[in-house]
C-alpha cells in the first residue's frame, strides 16, 4: 500500500519508508548505483561478447532499472544489457506510472516499459526491450529463495531494499552471504547503507568494501568488489546438472533442424552477434512445424510443478515476444476458453489458479450459466478463460526468424560430426561441404539423437518418441463465424480466420501413418458436432487435412542443454553411489564442450520455442538464464538417465 509525501514521493506503508530520495531520486540512482559500480567507465571499455549483467535487490518503482536503461542508451550498439531484479511486493502499473511521473527524462522509457509490465506471475518474468538489446528478468518473490534460483554470474549488484532497520529480512546475513553464488572475480556492488551488520556479512562473503560519500543528506554509502577468484557454485544445483561455462568466445554456431525450435534459436543467437548456419534437408518449417495454425496457453496443474511452471513462463514471454515480432497475419491474442474435461476437471482448474497465485489478468474461472462473449452455446459450460490465449502461424514465424541477418540457411542433410580442436566439423551429405563452428545445436525433432549417437558407440541418450497428430480445417458456418475466442476441451477449435477454422488435434503414439486418415477426421468432426452442435459443422465443411509427427519426451517437457556422454554418466552415478543422504558429495557431470540439444517440444512447440531459445542462447554464452535454476533442472538432457539410474 502506497501513500504519497507531498503528493510526489511514494512511501511504503508496510515499511514506513520512502522509495527514493525526495531531493532527486534519479540523481540518487546515478550517484549510488551507476557511479558506485563505476558503470560509465566499465561500459566504455566493455569489449566482450556477453551482456553486461546487473542484479538488483529491491525493484520498487523501477527507478533504478529505467535510469540504467537511459544511461545505457549511449552504449547500446556495443553490447547488450541484462538487468535482473528481485521484488517481493510489486507495485502495479498505475503506482509505478505515478511514482515516476516527476522524472521527465524517463517519459518515453517508462511508456515502453509499462506497455510490457503485465501478465506477471510469481517467480521469474522475462522481458526484452530495445530490439533485444536489453534483457530484463523480474523475480517476484522472497529474496532469499530468489538468489538461490539465479543460474549464472553477474557483473554488478545494486542493493536497494528499504533501510535495514525497516526491512531486516532483505538485509539478513544469509541473504547477503548468498550473493557469492551469483558473483565472480570483479563483480562490484553498491548500496546506500553502511550498517555494520551489512558490512560484516558482505566481507564474510568475499567482498572488499569501501565507504564513499553518500547522496544528499546521507553522509556515506558503500561500494565493494568480489575478490575471490574461485567461482562458488549454487548449492541448490545438483551435480548432474551444474552449469558448464564456455571456455572460448562463441562466434559461429551450426543448428541442425529448421523447424520452430531451430529457427527461433537461430534468431536468438544471431541477435547476439553470432553467425548461424541453419541446416535442414527439407527447408524451413517443412515438417511438423509447417502446420497451418497453432494455439497456445499455459498448462495448469493442481499444484505448481515442472510443466505448469515452465509453460507459465514460456507463455508470458511468448506473448511479449510475438507482440513486437509478429504481425496480425500470423499472430493474434483472441483469448482462450478451456472447458472442464475429465482430465482438466473443475477442482484441478480452480485449485490451479489459486495455488499458482495467478491474477485475473492472466486467467479466471467461469462458472456454469455465466454470460460469455461467445454466445448462447457456451453459457452452460464451466471452465477457465485465458485472457491472452493466442493463435499463430508457425511456418510464417519460422521463416521470419530465419531471415534475420547473420543466419545462413543450408539445404542439406547433416551426416557426420567430429571434433576439430576447439571447434566442430559437420559434413553436409548432398554437397560434401564441411561446416566448421564453435558449437553445434541439434534441433532436428525425433532425429535429435542419431548423429550424437555416433560419438557414444551408437547409444542415443535422449528418450524422444514420435506422436502422430492430425488436424483439419473447416469452412465457417453462419453461427461459427461469430466465435471470437479459441475453444478448448479434449480438442480445440480456433475462431474463423479468413473464413476458415482449425480443429485439432489427435494424439496417437502407435499409429505413425504420415498420411491423413478418415477415421481421425471423423473423430474430430464427431467431437465438434457433439460439443458445439449449434455450429452446424458437417463433412462438407472439411477443407484441409494435415498430419504431423510430434517429438515427445516422457515428461512432456523439452530437452534443452549440453550434450553429455551417457557411458561416463553411468560410471560416475552408479546405483550403489546414489544414496538417500543428499549431503554426499558427487563430482559434477562433465558435458561435451560445444554440443547442445534443443528438442522434444511435443504439442507445445510454439509455446516452448521462444523462451527455450533464450535459455539455450544464455547457456551457450555462459550468461544468466531467464528461468529459475529449479525450472532449468527439469529441462536438462541428463534428467532421464539420472532418474533411470536412481531406480
Curated annotation (Swiss-Prot):
It catalyses: 5-aminomethyl-2-thiouridine(34) in tRNA + S-adenosyl-L-methionine = 5-methylaminomethyl-2-thiouridine(34) in tRNA + S-adenosyl-L-homocysteine + H(+). It is found in: Cytoplasm. The keyword Methyltransferase applies. Residues 256-647 are annotated as: FAD-dependent cmnm(5)s(2)U34 oxidoreductase. One of its GO terms (molecular function) is oxidoreductase activity, acting on the CH-NH group of donors. SUPFAM superfamilies: FAD-linked reductases, C-terminal domain, FAD/NAD(P)-binding domain. Keywords: Cytoplasm, FAD, Flavoprotein, Methyltransferase, Multifunctional enzyme, Oxidoreductase, S-adenosyl-L-methionine, Transferase, tRNA processing. In the N-terminal section; belongs to the methyltransferase superfamily. tRNA (mnm(5)s(2)U34)-methyltransferase family. Catalyzes the last two steps in the biosynthesis of 5-methylaminomethyl-2-thiouridine (mnm(5)s(2)U) at the wobble position (U34) in tRNA. Catalyzes the FAD-dependent demodification of cmnm(5)s(2)U34 to nm(5)s(2)U34, followed by the transfer of a methyl group from S-adenosyl-L-methionine to nm(5)s(2)U34, to form mnm(5)s(2)U34. This is tRNA 5-methylaminomethyl-2-thiouridine biosynthesis bifunctional protein MnmC. It comes from Leptospira interrogans serogroup Icterohaemorrhagiae serovar Lai (strain 56601).
